[in-house]
Swiss-Prot record:
GO cellular component: cytosolic large ribosomal subunit
Entries under HAMAP family matching the protein: Ribosomal_uL16
Record region (Disordered): 1-22
Protein name: Large ribosomal subunit protein uL16
A molecular function (GO) term: tRNA binding
Species this protein is from: Acidovorax ebreus (strain TPSY) (Diaphorobacter sp. (strain TPSY))
Listed SUPFAM superfamilies: Ribosomal protein L16p/L10e
Length: 138
């Protein structure tokens, strides 16, 4: 699963996920992409599950790019622990997603195969997505 090798600080404040994606909002590497139209978080497990769904469907064909990286630690306190006594330990990592962000890209497969692979991947993600193709001349 994806997670940072090292971090300057173990824990991070919650913050707010606002605005739309101004970077990473177009297909840059492949021919087809899976773009999120919702705002939210993708955990490392969700990204990996979607990647596996794509890989299994296209079999040996094509090349896949993961355009997001889960670099934000989410901390939780254990069950049945009273409030206070400091912040909990980092449990998992998430990628903050704004509307318009391209999450996956693929090249080397026909459009119909890419559409079906991304449909299977989208079922693993908690956000609404749409299929996008590379713009010619962009």
């Amino acid at each position: 699963m994806l997670q940072p090798a090292r971090r300057k600080f173990r824990k991070e404040q919650k913050g707010r996920n606002t605005g739309v994606a101004t970077r990473g909002n177009s297909v840059a590497f492949g021919d087809f992409g899976l773009k999120c139209t919702d705002r939210g978080r993708l955990t490392a497990r969700q990204i990996e599950a979607a990647r596996r769904a794509i890989s299994r469907h296209v079999k040996r064909g094509g090349r896949i790019w993961i355009r997001v990286f889960p670099d934000k630690p989410i901390s939780t306190k254990p069950a049945e622990v009273r409030m206070g006594n400091g912040k909990g330990n980092p449990e998992y990592y998430v990628a903050e997603i704004q509307p318009g962000k391209v999450v996956f890209e693929i090249v080397g497969v026909p459009e119909e195969l890419a559409r079906e692979a991304f449909r299977l991947a989208a079922a693993k993600l908690p956000l609404r997505t749409t299929f996008v193709a590379r713009q010619i001349g962009a």
